[in-house]
């Protein structure tokens, strides 16, 4: 079963170089052993060091980029409307499109994935008002995380986020049962 973590709205702007703190700030139940590992190739875009716990944030790649992304998100943010409008598939077909349609008030929930818990977009999203994220690791992957972003100011937001996670759990269970089957069987 997925144990997603909902970010807590006490997320404070990052004013530390402690890489462990910034991840625990948005994903408190991350396993301690995660920080004893060497940064993977995707983490290395944002941090440098022998282990994640001893790493330093890269100024341009993480700190400045997060600041730029947060400023952009704030300009695109709008209060939640009473009724959501239909969106086109193209609007939400990219990670940015997925979270952008949520923060701009076009829909109550979206999902995307990141390749690192140090991804600046993830940290910027967690600082927006009335926006929350649930984070869980993708099955069969040591570095992909699924982010379910939703609006707290809409009753549909967390409800849809929880339903998405429930359906994802079912998919995981089915894929586990079919793990030894041929790809053709898995498609059906």
From Swiss-Prot:
Predominant location category: secreted
KW Secreted (keyword) present: yes
Lineage top rank: taxon: Bacteria
InterPro entries found in the cross-reference section: NleE/OspZ
Pfam families attached to this UniProt entry: NleE
Listed GO CC annotations: extracellular region; host cell cytoplasm; host cell nucleus
Keywords assigned: Host cytoplasm, Host nucleus, Plasmid, Secreted, Virulence
Subcellular location: Secreted; Host cytoplasm; Host nucleus
Function summary: Inactive effector protein: in contrast to other members of the family, does not have the ability to inhibit host cell NF-kappa-B activation. Probably lacks cysteine S-methyltransferase activity due to its inability to bind S-adenosyl-L-methionine at the C-terminus.
Stated family: Belongs to the NleE/OspZ family.
Name assigned to this protein: Inactive cysteine S-methyltransferase OspZ
């Amino acid at each position: 079963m997925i144990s997603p973590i909902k970010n807590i709205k006490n997320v404070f702007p990052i004013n530390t170089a402690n890489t462990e703190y910034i991840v625990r700030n948005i994903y408190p139940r991350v396993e301690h052993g995660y920080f004893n590992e060497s940064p993977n190739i995707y983490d290395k875009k944002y941090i440098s060091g022998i282990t994640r716990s001893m790493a330093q944030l890269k100024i341009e790649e993480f700190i400045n980029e997060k600041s730029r992304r947060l400023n952009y998100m704030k300009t695109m943010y709008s209060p939640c409307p009473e009724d959501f409008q239909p969106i086109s598939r193209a609007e939400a077909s990219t990670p940015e499109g997925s979270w952008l349609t949520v923060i701009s008030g076009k829909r109550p929930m979206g999902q995307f994935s990141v390749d690192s818990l140090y991804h600046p977009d993830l940290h910027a999203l967690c600082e927006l008002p009335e926006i929350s994220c649930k984070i869980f690791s993708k099955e069969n992957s040591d570095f992909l995380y699924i982010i379910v972003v939703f609006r707290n100011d809409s009753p549909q937001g967390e409800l849809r986020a929880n339903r998405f996670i429930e359906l994802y759990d079912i998919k995981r269970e089915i894929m586990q049962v079919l793990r030894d089957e041929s790809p053709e069987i898995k498609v059906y």
